Each structure stands twice: as structure tokens, then as C-alpha cells.
Amino acid sequence: MDATAYRGLLEEGLASLGVEAEPGGVEAVLLHLDLVREWNERMNLTAITDPQEMVIKHALDAASGLAVAGVEPGQRVIDVGTGAGFPGVVWKCLRPGIDLTLLESLQKRCRFLEEVGQAVIGPLAGGEGYQVVWGRAEDVGRNPAHRERYDLVTARAVAELRVLAEYCLPLARVGGRFLAMKGPSVGEEILAAEAAVEKLGGRLEEVRELELPDGGGRRSLVLIRKERPTPKAYPRRAGVPAKSPL
């Protein structure tokens, strides 16, 4: 990717979203996108490979989450089902001070994310505050090392909201938040997920709709506050939330 050609697109897009990059952040995001394209030749990381589309539909889409759920240095953040590192890696590039965990169920993608840690996050943040966890959300959500440990839990285009809630809310601390990054039409999903969110200890706090720059499409960002501990029965065993949503 020609960093000079796409740097301006990324910077202008971030400005339009109201997201400010910390020093070195823009360059780090572009390097991450380069690695995604390179590794995509060996494994399935993304169907979007045009450099301009990657900036808009991956980097800026990911960054839009920071416009709604601003994070502070030292806060613990987990990206559930991160895939190629969206939104988590982009957040870490733009906010190097966060303590980021990337949760991914495919081991080969975890290898890619570890390479990103060395090549991108290492030079930017000394490799600090960056962990890759191989596993399924249902299992990790029962692990005391992760359960109710995070200030912010996020997921992008992983599953419908009532399923995502069972994956993600058990990981958020009481008082923490869960940000679901969804497509343009989310109203029915939110209604269908109300009972699940309540059962898991959450409360809908905000739904913000925004338009990605340069015709990137409309997005809905759903922010849920964790108000009570999640009952010990949740998450259910691996595969059950998707097959039988709450």
C-alpha cells in the first residue's frame, strides 16, 4: 500500500469521525493494512483487498467505534472474534495506551495477530498491552482470568445482537461497557435482544448511527452498560448461544 497516497484518506476520514490519532498511529494503521493484504494471500483474512476500500471499510469502520466508546490509557479492552484485528488493532494503533486483548477462535489467525504485535505494536507501544488469546468466547467467558475483567468489550460483524450479548457481556466488569458494531438496520435486532441483555446484566445505553466517509456506508454502534454481574449459567457451552439464542 502506498502510504503517502492513503495517509491523507485515512487522516481526513478520522477527522470526519472526530477521532484523533496519537503520534505514529496513522502509520501503524497503514502498516497493519499492508500486513492484512500480504497474509491474505496465504489465509482468508478479508474479502476486501482494494487499498482504498480497506482504509474506508476496515480502518475507518473500526475507528468509528472510538467516536462512541472513547477509551482511556490503561483501560482493559477485549475484541471478541477479532479476525484480522478489526477493530482492536486499529484501536491500539490510535490509542497505544490501552491494554488490548484480541480473542480469536482460529489458530492460524492468531499467528497473524502475533506477527502484527511484533511488526506494528512493538515499535509503537513497545509490545506492551497487547495479548492474543486463542479460544471461543463461550469458554473464555467462563475463565476467571477473563470473566468480568474488561472495561470495554467489543465485537464487529460477528453475530446477531442477542448472540453477541451472551458472548460479550460476561467479559465486561460491572460498570464496564459492551460496544456492538453493526450494519445500517439494527432496530429489530435490538428489540429481539432486550431480554437477553437484561438477563446477562446489561442495559442499552446508546445507539448511534453514522455514515462512513467516502461512501463507505451506514453503520450502527450499539453501546450497552454492564450494571449487574452476569449469572453463572452464562455463557452457555460452546455453540449453544448461536443455535439457541436467549
From Swiss-Prot:
Q: Which GO terms describe its molecular function?
A: rRNA (guanine-N7-)-methyltransferase activity
Keywords in alphabetical order: Cytoplasm, Methyltransferase, rRNA processing, S-adenosyl-L-methionine, Transferase
Q: Which Gene3D superfamilies does the entry mention?
A: Vaccinia Virus protein VP39
Q: Which residues are listed as membrane-spanning?
A: none
Renumbered residue ranges of the record's region Disordered: 221-246
Which InterPro entries does this UniProt record tie to the protein?
Answer: rRNA_ssu_MeTfrase_G, SAM-dependent_MTases_sf
| Protein family membership | Belongs to the methyltransferase superfamily. RNA methyltransferase RsmG family.
Task of the protein: Specifically methylates the N7 position of a guanine in 16S rRNA.
**What HAMAP family does the database record attribute to this sequence?**
16SrRNA_methyltr_G (MF_00074)
Protein name, UniProt field:
Ribosomal RNA small subunit methyltransferase G
Q: Which organism is it from?
A: Symbiobacterium thermophilum (strain DSM 24528 / JCM 14929 / IAM 14863 / T)
